[in-house]
Amino acid sequence: MADNKSCPRVDIGGQAVLEGVMMKAPDAIAITVRRPDGTMVVQRKEYTPASKKHKWMGWPIIRGVVSMGSMLSMGMSTLEDSMKMLGEEYEEEPTKFEKWLAEKLGKNIDKVVMGVAIVLAVIMAVGLFMALPAGVEALTGWLIDLFTKGASAAPAWKGVTVTVVGGITKVVILIAYMAFCGMVPDVARTFRYHGAEHKAVYCNENDLPLTPENAAPFTTLHPRCGTAFMFIVMIISMILFLFVGRDIEAFWPRFLLHLALLPVVAGVSYEVLKGLAHSDNRFTRIARWPGLQMQRLTTKEPDMQMLEVAIVSMNVALHGMPENAPLTEEGWAVLTDYRQSEKGYAFTDEEKAAILDKADEDDDDDDEDDDE
């Protein structure tokens, strides 16, 4: 077995998926899930950042917009991949509509479904976090006019009040949405894998050997988390609109202005997130605190098995797929121990045979259950 040495320090992050963790290294993405039989299935895909293809996409502000779009697309695709990797027991019987789509679209159905899912996610996000707050802002402006009726002019504080109320509304909606998601058992379990991802990242950042025991003591709250990013977006948005368009009262012009400036808000927020994450002083610790507290809603304490999954993803993202590992028909590696993902680990023929035999037994059991 290879010595369990720490990973080289590189910029690596990830996300929780169904019963697993995705880790993104500078040049690859690894997804690991734990199947009901206890085995871990892992895949690795080569990854080239957009900034390497087009230099201008790595410029400040612009890179934040690119990163947001990339993570949305990547998040959807990794969730789909994790469901496939979990096996048939997690796949629902396709509906008549899905069967009809499959006949019409053939191999392109996955791309179409993914595109529709992304569009729906964007529409929901825009509706919840932009249209609804804009409506509250319009209502607030109307109420101010109602209670100051008879005044020669609108009060000077009206624009500021409307903008602050809109910003607070966004934060309240975000908190309520995340709290509601955490009440769903499957999502709550995914939040535990989210915590495992953060602990593994901390372990790597502190140059410790990647083991569940070393990762466990770390907090589940990480300054570079997407939850913190969303909170920063809300705050930057509120600050920006204190100066831009605060006197626009009608719903549609105000909503469209917020929508048009969303890329600017996202780009600035990304730079703020990176700055706060990579600096450690009294000011940055205070500024990071609200975003870290928001993560108490989206991360939960993982168990040791979840930490093992996160560590496998990190090892594979950094070092590549385990050599000579037993593979599924799809080319995914099957592991029974997180140490099998360490760089330089060599599977024995006996190990491979035992893992494949176990997989065959589980498949036979599933077939018998289907026959019953």
Regions found by a protein language model. Give the residues of each.
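Divalent-cation
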Residues: 1-87, 94
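Transmembrane alpha-helical segments and their cytosolic interface motifs
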Residues: 109-127, 218-244
